[in-house]
């Protein structure tokens, strides 16, 4: 696939030849179209729920994560909370904004106080090129030199107008895309550093992860760099057998929970 060889320097001549090949160009065009489709799909989902509807949901829900977020505003237990998310959407950012919880996006904004930091190694619909004209179109130009993170900026409005952005599509490995997507490698390194900073007194929560083979390499990198003595909670009603086995073998203080309703009580080391 495109992902497997695009970063190999010795393949550059072959890549250029393939761009000029009518036979193979269809696959590269499909790759370009997939990026635009994913951006547009998640942007449309985002626009389907206006802020007032989201605030209404947050005010009446018993969702465990909301309980956790609300606890953050009153608790002084944690001086820093880091979210490493592989989601393209901006629901987390919007929820934190609605709850008036300051946060920063790693690579784009300075840390807030108290510090809630979000790291998105696979990109986001909010990552767009600087000075980009908001016209919807599919660009078939293949930029083999890549886009660095300082060439991107955050945007939260009119996201359906952007045909280009920064996301790693499914089956993409940010390590192998360090040439064509250096912004992703920067954020992947930031996530690794965050993992290394975890101490035995810290809490780690894992959820929403399938442990599919294409993401396994990245997830293993984070898991193996975490402190084995930290408190580790995995939330999944049907945990993948392979992932569960890995977590049991790594972490001494491992707890598996079936519902996010439990997350609301993780502060102070308690469950609800």
Indicate where each model-derived feature is located.
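SIR2/sirtuin-family catalytic core signature
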Residues: 185-272
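Alpha-helical interaction segments
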Residues: 21, 54-55, 202
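Extended, H/D-rich, highly charged conserved domains that either
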Residues: 1-43, 58-61, 68-176, 182
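Charged, alpha-helical interface segments at or near domain boundaries
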Residues: 35, 48-50
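Short, flexible loop segments at the rims of nucleotide/cofactor-binding pockets, characterized by
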Residues: 54-62, 179-186, 209-211
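Catalytic-core regions built around general acid/base machinery
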Residues: 64-78, 193-196, 221-226
């Amino acid at each position: 696939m495109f992902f497997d060889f695009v970063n190999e320097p010795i393949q550059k001549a072959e890549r250029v030849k393939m761009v000029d090949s009518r036979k193979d160009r269809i696959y590269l065009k499909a790759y370009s179209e997939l990026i635009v489709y994913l951006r547009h799909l998640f942007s449309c989902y985002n626009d389907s729920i206006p802020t007032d509807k989201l605030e209404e949901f947050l005010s009446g829900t018993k969702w465990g994560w909301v309980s956790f977020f609300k606890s953050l505003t009153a608790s002084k237990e944690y001086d820093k909370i880091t979210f490493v998310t592989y989601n393209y959407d901006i629901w987390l950012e919007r929820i934190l904004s609605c709850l008036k919880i300051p946060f920063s996006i790693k690579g784009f904004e300075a840390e807030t106080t108290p510090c809630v930091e979000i790291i998105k190694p696979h990109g986001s619909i909010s990552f767009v090129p600087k000075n980009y004209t908001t016209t919807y179109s599919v660009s078939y130009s293949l930029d083999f030199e890549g886009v660095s993170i300082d060439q991107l900026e955050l945007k939260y409005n009119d996201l359906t107008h952007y045909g280009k952005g920064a996301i790693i599509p499914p089956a993409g490995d940010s390590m192998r895309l360090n040439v064509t997507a250096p912004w992703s490698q920067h954020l992947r390194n930031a996530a690794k550093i965050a993992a290394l900073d975890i101490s035995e007194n810290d809490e780690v929560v894992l959820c929403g992860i399938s442990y599919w083979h294409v993401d396994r390499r990245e997830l293993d990198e984070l898991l193996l760099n975490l402190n084995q003595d930290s408190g580790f909670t995995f939330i999944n009603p049907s945990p993948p057998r392979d992932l569960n086995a890995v977590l049991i073998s790594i972490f001494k203080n491992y707890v598996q929970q079936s519902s996010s309703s439990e997350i609301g009580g993780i502060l102070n080391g308690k469950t609800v």
